[in-house]
Amino acid sequence: HHEVLAKGFSAIRKMTDKKLSEILNAEENSATYNAIRKEFPSDDIKTTARRFFIFGILSDIFAKTTGFCGGVAGSMHIFFPPFGIFPSNAIVGASASIAAGAALFKKLQKKKGVVIANLGDGAAGRGPVFEAMNFASMKQFDSFWEEGYNGGLPLLFNFSNNYYGMNADTENETMSFSGDVARFGSFEEKGMKAEKVDGWNIPSLADA
C-alpha cells in the first residue's frame, strides 16, 4: 500500500489546516476521527490527519468499523476520495479504466494535477488496461477538441513489476513481457512516453 500512503501523506502536506479540519470533522469520518482523538490526541492538525489516515487504513485491513470503508475494504480495496485516492475493484487492471475517466474529468474541468493508475505486472496483459491506454491516446484529443481542451489526458500508468500476477508467472504468460515499455509506447502515433525504471533506485524514480 505504499502508493496509497504516499498519496495520502502528500495530500495532507499540501492541504490547508482548514481543509483538513473539514475532512476530519465530516460526518462520514466520525468513527475514525473520534477514535483517533480519544487514543492519540494532538493539537497539531497535520499530525492528527496523518494518524487518522494510517488508522483508517489499518482499521479496514483488520475489518474494523473505524475504517474508511467500514471495515469491508480489506487490504485490496481501500480508498479515500478526500485525499484523492480512488477505489480499486476486484477486476485485475480495471482501475486503469477508472483512472482514465478521472483524468478525462480533470481535463474537462481544467483541474491541475495528474491521475496515476497504479498497476501490477499481471495487469500488463489485461484488456481493461489496453482499453484505457487506447482511450487516453485517441487522436481526436488533438484534432477535434477545441482550443483549451485539446491535448492528451493528464494520466500516468505506473506498473510495479514483482513478476507475479495473482499466482501466475507473468513473464511466461504475458505477450512480449520483457518489451512492455516498447509495447505501451506504441499506442500513440507520436509515441506514448514510456520508461523502465529500477524501483530500488530512488534518484531514478524521482527523475522519471
Model feature map: region roles:
Residues 1-153, 166-169, 173-191:
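Cofactor-binding active-site loop characterized by glycine-rich and histidine/acidic residues
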Residues 90, 197-198:
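Glycine- and other small-residue-rich loops at beta-strand/loop junctions that grip anionic moieties
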Residues 123, 199-202:
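Short, surface-exposed acidic/glycine-rich loop or hinge patches that mediate macromolecular interfaces
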Residues 156-160:
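Short internal beta-strands
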Residues 161-164, 201:
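Glycine-rich beta-alpha junction loops
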Residues 192-196:
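Structural signal for short hydrophobic segments within the conserved structured cores
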Residues 202-208:
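Structural signature of the thiamine diphosphate
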